[in-house]
Amino acid sequence: MDSLPDAILQYILSYLTSARDVAACNCVSKRWKESTDSVKSVVFHRNSFESIMETDDSDSIVRKMISSSRRLEELVVYSPFTSSGLASWMMHVSSSLRLLELRMDNLASEEVVVEGPLKLDCIGVAKNLEILKLWGVLMMSPPKWDMFPNLRSLEIVGAKMDDSSLSHALRACPNLSNLLLLACEGVKSISIDLPYLEHCKLDFYGQGNTLLVLTSQRLVSLDVQGCSWIRVPETKFLKNLSISSVTGRVYMVDFNNLSSLEALSIRGVQWCWDAICMILQQARDVKHLFMKVEFTGNEALQPFPEIDFVEFFNNHPKLQTFDIHGAMFAALCQKNSLKKLETGFTIPCLEEVVITVRSPLNAEQKMNTLESLVKYARGLKRMVIRILRMKSNHSSADDFCDDICKFRHMNEHLVHIE
């Protein structure tokens, strides 16, 4: 390395990212120390200062290291820091930073919670940020952010916030194309209007009764968890949609246009039947469908009503992969579900189906439905039958499992049992 020209040495060292590696290079020689000023990205891992007791000391070490860089573009800090330390860092590198990722740890203790919002305020001076990632955020008051005109990606993981604070933060990021909010607690009603947003993942933690209104003409993928009412009026380019609710009910979903939708996933303990019907009706051209909803009903838990097998597949002619769990499969296996079957009926595009069976009840109809899938889906390449938590003490359980095994042997090139 000593025989290399300065320019090549600087070029090689500029690819260092770990703060410990940069610090080690500074100790090699004066020439190496001077060459590390070309480092553009520095990562301080969680254990970077495990031998240092005082956070103020680690703050000063970070400041010295980042201030020695001519143009630091990416700063990632997982180690503990104070708001005053962050403010001093931003004074040195705010104009050049493009990516900032911070483990805020605002939720760790009451003492930190008091100073937490100040950390958010310090970030506001980094006007040229393109990517901002924050972990463990307290946002119970609006952050003092003016505007991030270049910010394209905002990710917040683990947060306590209220509606007005989140709205204020998003207004400071008008040009976002990627928004990720995971495990965010306290949001009850949020309206998001981001004209350039393409990818959005929202995970609201709590009772699962959040109201969401999202407006973006460019939206391509949307993943929502924890919302009971969802309205997205502009979805002309939406290709991937996932809606789930672990704790609450999904009462209403309103999407204006799902003509481009290719993949749809709906999950949850309970969805209102109107919401299920609406989303399935709007997603007529979907190619990949995943359904894991246990019950329907506006208040009390209700089983799925009967679904006509022929109408369902006629309404989704482009379906290629279909993953259905207990309740939906049972709805397709009712007494009259197969009554419209006729010789001209086909399922033209279906290639793979995964079926989760949880009950031996209505076994004969379930076997008829499985046989119909094989018969009418001429292009079927794979069928997976998952037997999950079936109560073996039920009188018909053994017979049903025997029937499934026989069905598998008759179609061993297609059918797999898990």
Curated annotation (Swiss-Prot):
Xref: SUPFAM superfamilies: F-box domain, RNI-like
GO cellular component: plasmodesma
Gene3D superfamilies: 1.20.1280.50, Ribonuclease Inhibitor
F-box domain segment(s): 1-47
Cited Pfam families: F-box-like (PF12937), LRR_At5g56370 (PF24758)
Top-rank lineage group of the source organism: Eukaryota
UniProt-listed PROSITE patterns: FBOX
PANTHER family, sorted: F-BOX/RNI SUPERFAMILY PROTEIN-RELATED, FBD DOMAIN-CONTAINING PROTEIN
Protein name as annotated: F-box protein At1g10780
Organism: Arabidopsis thaliana (Mouse-ear cress)
